[in-house]
């Protein structure tokens, strides 16, 4: 076959774009669920909103744990999917389900035994702690179901089954918003439960999500066939070793990033109330644009793993080049959309003149950042990591975020006393520090690692 810069495989595009669109919509709906919770609790009381936000700091770490153990599964399983070998995929999935189950039980016990210590780490306000305690008391039981659900969805994604995740997100949005509206405010004859109502809504949604995906895997799925044999219950020592080698760097990288996020938010939070408001508004729009980038990263990981599994090195390189160019194009489009809609978006808020001006400046900064982020994240976490090189992303994240960005941002904010836009530029500068090494690594093609074992 003649070598080409872009992939000419029609099946590649037929598989890529449905993945990208469906995962984008799923991410958008999931983000909207969180937004709806915040809006309804914010309208009920500030303490309820703050209490839920406090518990969500804990849940954010759990979400990232689910993402990283799922990503480790996808990296290996998608390569076996490229070879159409289902038994190793079922074995790896079974092993990761056991990890998720043990982690979920541990988290429930931790939150049951030490709720005060966990919540007290974030605030000393007794009113907020009381609301957070009521929320955590109910929500903690969803941690196990959430982790298991996400592992099952990751296994399905590794074999290019993503529509069920979108359907689940849609159902979860409707159920969660409906129950929250009913129980938070006490509508339709139900008692007014406030933050406890929000927790009950989330718990019911999580139970429903688990039931739907479990029934789908058992009764409907025709690819994974998870329980068609006893492979899911068998732990192969070699496969376990392969998973650990892949998942540990992914886990460390994900957790380091997850810990850095609230630290970056805290830096702006200690500058001024206008900075908090401006960052909140600008970040909301940025996150909505980011769902496409996250989807591209997820889709790229599956596509690259599948390509490497097939063993056609020329097609792997062509597919990677195609994806990287698409990443740059998507970044420029998203950045332009964010920039040209800033006036309309700002008109939806009532902010002080200072906060409005600051928000506009931050949106412009984030529109520019979007271009870099839309390249480095899908290439680094999608193409390179999806093709089997999980250690490189760990090194890049450690050095750029913890070695450069956080020290630079802390110095800019509290030592050099730079203006808030300059501090935000420092906080977002990891897109530059990550972008160059990721580009150079990408061009070397040393990231193509075969992870599958011969039959």
Listing of model-derived features with the role each one plays in the protein:
Residues 70, 139-158, 165-173, 198-214, ...:
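Short runs within selected transmembrane alpha-helices of multi-pass transporters and secretion channels
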Residues 1-23, 77-144, 192-247, 304-370, ...:
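Short alpha-helical transmembrane segments in multi-pass integral membrane proteins
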Residues 25, 29, 33, 62-66, ...:
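Residue-level hotspots within pore-lining transmembrane alpha-helices
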Residues 35-39, 151-155, 178-185, 214, ...:
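Alpha-helical transmembrane segments of multipass membrane proteins
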Residues 49-109, 146-165, 278-342, 373-396:
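Small-residue-rich hydrophobic transmembrane alpha-helices
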Residues 15, 30-31, 63-65, 71, ...:
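Hydrophobic alpha-helical transmembrane segments of integral membrane proteins
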